[in-house]
Amino acid sequence: MNKLKLGLIIFTATVIAACSGVSNESQADTGQKSESTAELKTLPLEVFKSPTCGCCGKWISHVKDSGFETKIRNRQSLNAIKAKFDIPSNLQSCHTSVSKDGYFFEGHIPAKYIRKFLDNPPADAAGLAVPGMPAGSPGMEYGDRFQPYKIFLKKKDGSIEVFAEVNTLEEQFNDA
């Protein structure tokens, strides 16, 4: 079996395993916020995900704990929402979020980078993406395992550039 097929099988198995569990967190938006984020400006996100995806529920808990309000849209297929925002297959992940201003946030992007983007959107930006499901990213925690990853900026003209590089587990959450 060639390396590409083996890699595809391993990636598919990881996605299925990560998304097949039901999240322990309630996915209903209760409107409650932790004390540490109560004073932050609350930002709404509409989250499109599979109804059975456990890692999506964990990511939703992460953004809610960081001061975002979420509206969950469970879908059997996410192809239509990804097509609507013209998210190329090489940037796709297991869930797509949309801000009230129409920017998309694809995959396991740490909340601090979404907030940074929304506080000062780059010119001609369409959205941000973390392709795949990097181990250790918010919602994809596996003990101490961490896989460095890039957050990509997609512009309205279709061009893609690196918005941020996340090289350690800690820098996903720290503002330094």
Indicate where each model-derived feature is located:
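Bacterial N-terminal signal peptides that target proteins for export
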Residues: 1-8
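C-terminal motif of bacterial Sec signal peptides marking the signal peptidase cleavage site
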Residues: 15-18
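Bacterial signal peptide processing site
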Residues: 20-23
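Local sequence-structure signature of Cys/Sec-based thiol-disulfide redox active-site neighborhoods
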Residues: 37-60, 64-66, 99
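Stable alpha-helical elements in mature extracytoplasmic
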Residues: 52, 59, 74-77, 110-114
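Sec-exported extracytoplasmic/periplasmic mature domains
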Residues: 58-68, 83-90, 103-104, 119-122
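Structural microenvironment flanking redox-active thiols in thiol-disulfide oxidoreductases
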Residues: 75-87, 133-138
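Thiol/selenol-based redox catalytic cores and closely related redox-interacting motifs
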Residues: 90-175
